[in-house]
Amino acid sequence: LAVFRPSENRWYVQSSSSGKVRTFDLGSAGTDLLLPADYTGDGKADAAVYRNGVWHLIDSDTGEHESFESGFDDGRPVPADLDRDGRIEFAVFRKGTWYVYDGSSLVSHKFGLEDDHPLGPVPVRASLPGR
C-alpha cells in the first residue's frame, strides 16, 4: 500500500510482507504526475514521477534515486510493459509519436495523429483536493 501526502511532498509505503512503513520525498504537489509501477521488474512498484519531460524514480529495493529525460514538456507519459518482459517501460506520447526508454536506449515510433490522446494508465496529479 502507498500514499502520497501533498502537504509534505512525501510518499508513505507499507510493506505487504512485514507491515513496516517506509517514507521518502519525491515529487512536488500540483506540478508532478505520480506514476508508480514496476520499472525494475522485481514484482514491486517503484515510486516515480514525471515533470517537464524528466522521469524521477526511486527503486523499491535499493532506495536509489534516478532521473533521466525521455520526453518533452508537452509530452504525455504512458508507462506500460510494451515488450511484455515484466518491466514497465518509460513511454511518452507527443504529437503522434511514441518515445520509449527501455532502460538503455530511447526509441521513437510514429503512431497516431498530432491531436490524438494515448490510451494507457492514467497519470495522477499530486494535487488531489482533500486527499
Protein language model features and the residues they cover:
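Trp/Gly-enriched beta-strand/coil motifs that build multi-repeat beta-propeller-like domains
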Residues: 1-131
